[in-house]
Amino acid sequence: GSFTGLAAMTRSELTIRNVSFENLGIIPAQFARLGIRFEQHGDDIYIPQQEHYRIENFMDGSIMTIADAPWPGLTPDLLSVFLVVATQAKGSVLIHQKMFESRLFFVDKLIDMGAQIILCDPHRATVIGHDHQMRLRATRMTSPDIRAGVALLIAAMSAEGTSTIQNIEQIDRGYKDIDGRLNALGARITRVEE
């Protein structure tokens, strides 16, 4: 899920191999609701380069809601990635974190980067997408946890300029050698000692 979000945010083409597609549950369908196109090739997922992606609306035109739920629902660990991806989509979406407290308290960092997000309460945030018309701005930020950390990393990679993320140990706990893996894909990530 994180790499799918990264491909969308950076407008990159990406093939993710050996994803065990049958075990992804509704994750691919939720990305499709954000307008992210992908193709299943056996057990691989191919995400083509996309200049734009449009968030679906409900049939009556009302704003789409993406919410977490116990399996087979959407894993709460990906909500932060969906939130970041929505910042550059065309349209608006309500992200509803039902299962945990305080997981949306990283949105202030995205707002500092130029994202249009309204934090409704500790469980809900409305994202108004930029449709890639306004790039996020680089900034200095601190990773509060694994999920928010990788979402901030995705935001930083799509932003204009150089960002600094502190407390990267949080990201390392969930994503082994993330900088090496992303640099192999063309990213420019450097670890610095402070």
What spans do the regions from the language model cover?
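Short, structured segments at the rim of ligand-binding sites
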Residues: 1-194
